[in-house]
């Protein structure tokens, strides 16, 4: 029996098949869900507009006044969630409209947000869908290969992926049934980091640093730099900038806390 949050998401997009299409997974996989998997909450929220607090109230409760919410970790989680959503699939027209309203401060990261807003305003969903295909899928392969194993070994499904699966298993984070992408895919790693940074996956304190240092820092910054400079990147150029800057900020922050 589906929980209310999953039912609301299905209604919001017009049915199970449409939600499966938007997520890029098989319809039977979603039909087997009782609730939205933890690692899919951010993506489903982005695609449907249904709040994460509705999708998974057990993970995303409304904070009470006087709570000990860490604003920095919340901001980190939001940045990772944004990157995860944009790397998982091309943004819809509705998401582009919301992105066009982004604002930023005079910091490099803030200016990258402004650049993303401008890029979102200057394109269409159809154009970005083609750009996404050319960059990450392609005929045979895309311009970029957004996988940790590929960046670290030159091949897919190598030892870096196995080590990541071991560490995720220790944290109780399991691969979603029907998801064809390996866990070392850039979007999946960003979604996992969003959940860890926001304390939403039930992992022990410091788990975000462990995953970052072992599985994110060795390659994801290089991927974002490549995306920033990719020949086919127009909308995705500022996405690469945001990712590269976030990787630098994270590495520096974890080093200071060591």
What positions do the PLM features span?
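Recognition helix of helix-turn-helix/homeodomain-like DNA-binding domains
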Residues: 22-37
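Surface/interface-facing alpha-helical segments and adjacent flexible terminal/loop regions used
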Residues: 67-258
């Amino acid at each position: 029996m589906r929980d209310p949050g999953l039912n609301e998401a299905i209604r919001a997009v017009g049915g199970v098949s449409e939600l499966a299409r938007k997520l890029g997974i098989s319809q039977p996989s979603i039909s087997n869900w009782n609730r939205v998997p933890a690692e899919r909450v951010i993506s489903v929220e982005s695609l449907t507009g249904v709040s994460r607090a509705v999708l998974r109230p057990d993970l995303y409760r409304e904070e009470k006044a006087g709570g000990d919410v860490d604003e920095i970790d919340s901001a980190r989680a939001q940045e990772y969630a944004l990157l995860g959503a944009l790397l998982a699939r091309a943004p819809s027209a509705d998401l582009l409209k919301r992105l066009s309203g982004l604002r930023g401060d005079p910091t490099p990261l803030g200016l990258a947000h402004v650049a993303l807003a401008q890029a979102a305003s200057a394109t269409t969903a159809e154009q970005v869908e083609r750009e996404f295909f050319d960059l990450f899928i392609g005929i045979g392969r895309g311009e970029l290969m957004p996988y940790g194993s590929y960046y670290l070994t030159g091949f897919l499904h190598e030892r870096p992926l196995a080590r990541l699966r071991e560490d995720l298993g220790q944290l109780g984070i399991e691969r979603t049934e029907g998801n064809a992408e390996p866990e070392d895919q850039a979007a999946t790693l960003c979604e996992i980091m969003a959940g860890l940074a926001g304390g939403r996956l039930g992992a022990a304190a410091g788990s975000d640093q462990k995953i970052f240092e072992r599985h994110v820092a060795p390659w994801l910054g290089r991927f974002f730099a490549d995306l920033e400079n990719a020949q086919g990147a127009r909308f995705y150029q500022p996405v690469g900038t945001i990712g590269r800057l976030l990787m630098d900020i994270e590495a520096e922050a974890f080093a200071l806390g060591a």
